[in-house]
């Protein structure tokens, strides 16, 4: 299921739009009601491209009891694990939509969306760690940001799988290849009816 995030960065925004709640509570209930789908943690995954990649990572780290795995493809803005990435984007990225979602740089009320502390805490309860898969194109303009995110996950002690795609950038050519790879190789899909 692909749903519109309206430049919310997949969080409950600073000014009243609860997108994190929508994606992690409301949408799963709708999916369960409309489609033959499993409510079990082991059968629930989240995948995102670009801003959605950071959203996917955030969902899995904040709701590890519901999402067993997350795939972050080219995620380089929004919810961040790396403290430097997070503070720099809040100060320097000239995007009104970023401010509309997170609030202004001096606003510290978005603590749940700063993921390093959460990632570190999750390592203390390894029985609920989600499987994490991160990939970025070698020529992606946000590759260095993604590398800092990778390094922050390592510092936090979270296990994950990381790949860089040679010759590819922030583009559908990369996402098509790696979304297929996620479905065929990374995610533990059962590939059988659940009804």
Model segments located where?
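Non-catalytic cap/lid and distal C-terminal segments of serine-dependent acyl enzymes
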Residues: 1-195
């Amino acid at each position: 299921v692909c749903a519109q995030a309206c430049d919310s960065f997949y969080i409950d925004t600073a000014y009243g739009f609860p997108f994190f709640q929508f994606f992690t509570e409301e949408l799963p209930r709708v999916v369960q009601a409309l489609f033959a789908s499993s409510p079990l943690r082991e059968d629930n995954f989240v995948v995102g491209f670009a801003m959605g990649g950071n959203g996917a990572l955030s969902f899995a780290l904040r709701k590890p009891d519901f999402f067993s795995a997350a795939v972050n493809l080219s995620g380089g803005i929004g919810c961040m694990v790396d403290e430097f990435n997070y503070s720099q984007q809040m100060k320097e990225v000239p995007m009104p939509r970023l401010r509309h979602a997170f609030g202004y740089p001096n606003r510290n009320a978005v603590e749940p969306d700063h993921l390093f502390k959460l990632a570190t805490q999750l390592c203390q309860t390894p029985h609920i760690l989600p499987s994490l898969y991160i990939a970025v194109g070698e020529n992606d303009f946000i590759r260095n940001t993604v590398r800092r995110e990778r390094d922050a996950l390592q510092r936090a002690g979270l296990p994950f799988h990381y790949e860089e795609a040679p010759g590819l950038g922030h583009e559908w050519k990369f996402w098509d290849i790696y979304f297929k790879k996620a479905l065929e190789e990374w995610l533990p899909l059962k590939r059988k009816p659940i009804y």
